[in-house]
């Protein structure tokens, strides 16, 4: 796409254009084939009235342009203008500016340009440079950029549009660009940041081509290679996992200790807890999770001076646009005006995942505050629930992806572990770490901060009443769609969960056309007007949640192995939400696979646009004060289990309107259209009026500009949380500080991207309200960290040089007396450390994976073990540094053979002895 400032030389060919003419033509049909809209194209050539269909039909508009040499055409749905000769979008406002300077034949009748161009009122149009900020926000909101289909890539486009309209995540990439740093390939976070910047930039194109991100995701997961349609939910999980992996940072040790303490407290309680809680009250199933949490979007600011607020924000052009609109919305709220659903969604969405910050801050003795006890203090629970033994909190289902790399269907079959009602019991045992005795590091990222929640799962033995608990982290909830009988049981409070398998949707999708759309619309209208006894009860999202969290009896083939009874017993498993995420991702399991066939559950599930209350599903231990959510975006799948097409419906954060994102086409729709869609994935955001009032107060303080003697540095990332989260948690300055209170040497050169300077009055207010810290008035490089870094680099250099030297000598030895074996699992950890890929050294050498003990007690190498061979000197060197074992020698010293003469003499004596 060409830039909006580039002038198309073919603009002189345009006839007189009015908005009324275009609206009239949009109600017509293609003059070649008679098909109706949407997305008809009108020729803009002088005196040419032609209207043709687009690429979704026979593309007669392009044929007309090629035959008649009429270069300019306008889309009658989006009102964007395309030049076939220049092969890019053009902007008619620039034509006016040029032609008014030099007399134009077609505009010579006008002495001055009209007050507003006919196309200017269309919300999707790109703003002129000369337009005021408010006019740009009101008439031409950002973020309405389509995405080109790269070949059955609608699953990716719909997912990216839904994420793009999640303010906490988007604002992080727009305003905290300095934190988007990684040395991990394929640097997907960089591709995503670039894509978001293009989509939300003031001079955005009509659509973007997400080639870089598509290429990166294919490198990460081979399942997405080729041109087969894939499941948008699987894509979301894979994308967020990779973003977390690239952006994750180690958590402060004190935070991890608090997490462990919290988890141990909730583990293996007995009947006393059972007396306080009913099975249905605390039940939980294995949720479908994905990556971690993220930070946010620049919304939800308080009303006040624009300059004052800029002290709290990065001066990024795209970020300012979103912030300005939110200030307007906050002012409207403070005046007591009634707001639309969409406005509430924009502002009221903060996150209790800010608890990650809370934990980090708790190591500082700070004054307590109501907001500092945000429930999501589990950045990444290091709990005994060992749901995640790895550093990132991704669900095991991601390993399952590889098994479907050859599938051509839309939603690949998900692992049972991810499925809501059909879960697998997990014992509270420490996962094997392959002999790595060092403390496993906990990590957090913007993904985990935004999307991570946790659930408390309890299993009760019905014989001894023992209750064991497990904490699991989730990033999305995969909910079953209950049938008529299930609904009746649910409403009777005796519902039993029924396993359901999410399935696959097709490779390709041919347009359903207007007839199918009208038939479906009429069907839904008739259903809504017909008594429920005829069609059956209406399924709501709350019903799906109730089905997911209903108690599950463990009996028959699924009996519970009770550790107290030491045998299989009947039991009950139940769960509740322990920590609410800022952005709640809900996945409705519409695809099911049987042995011989697959099918799609097309039941309409009604869902609220605002006010989704999760209080009925919260655990007693949950401390979140914000429990209601407003809808941000919906991903829909049209078609069957064999073929289909994905589109997204998203609410624009700037004007509060709903839009349909169908690949490169973006169309405004009414909220009633959104309520009637067949939802597949929904994104909800926390809503909090208190958070908006808090932002307004901070902006007012900043606007006063009271003189102060001290300046305070605050983490830009935490400030972004404050602007976009409902519960940002305590102030977290550890994102730019080391454990000694200084700046880590590797962050000092871009420290300006990590901090924001606040006046003393603002800092004191935030500190008294949220706690945390520590207070920072001076930035300096930490000398202790510098010494440690130099010592660590020297240690790595010595170890790797010594190993290379000893290994060379081993390779040169023709017949070594003894060869030692070492576990490749441990060796890879050591190699990652000495090469600088891992900051922590490995634990003691652990050869238990490759060793087996014979009856005599002799240790031998296990058959087919993953091991490497090293010399005795190398083993001695590594063992002296790290310890561990056991020693495994596969070729020991051989005793010296007797000389031939003595051997011959012995044989002669033996022969004579036998003769006698």
From Swiss-Prot:
Family annotation (PANTHER family): UBIQUITIN CARBOXYL-TERMINAL HYDROLASE, UBIQUITIN CARBOXYL-TERMINAL HYDROLASE 20
Domain free text: The UBP-type zinc finger binds 3 zinc ions. However, it does not bind ubiquitin, probably because the conserved Arg in position 55 is replaced by a Glu residue.
Organism: Mus musculus
PTM comment text: Ubiquitinated via a VHL-dependent pathway for proteasomal degradation.
Chain sites annotated for binding Zn(2+) 3: 43, 48, 64, 70
Known function: Deubiquitinating enzyme that plays a role in many cellular processes including autophagy, cellular antiviral response or membrane protein biogenesis. Attenuates TLR4-mediated NF-kappa-B signaling by cooperating with beta-arrestin-2/ARRB2 and inhibiting TRAF6 autoubiquitination. Promotes cellular antiviral responses by deconjugating 'Lys-33' and 'Lys-48'-linked ubiquitination of STING1 leading to its stabilization. Plays an essential role in autophagy induction by regulating the ULK1 stability through deubiquitination of ULK1.
Region (Disordered): 258-420
Name by which UniProt lists this protein: Ubiquitin carboxyl-terminal hydrolase 20
Residue stretches making up the DUSP domain: 689-782, 791-894
Highest taxon, organism lineage: Eukaryota
Residue spans of biased composition, Basic and acidic residues class: 260-280, 317-333
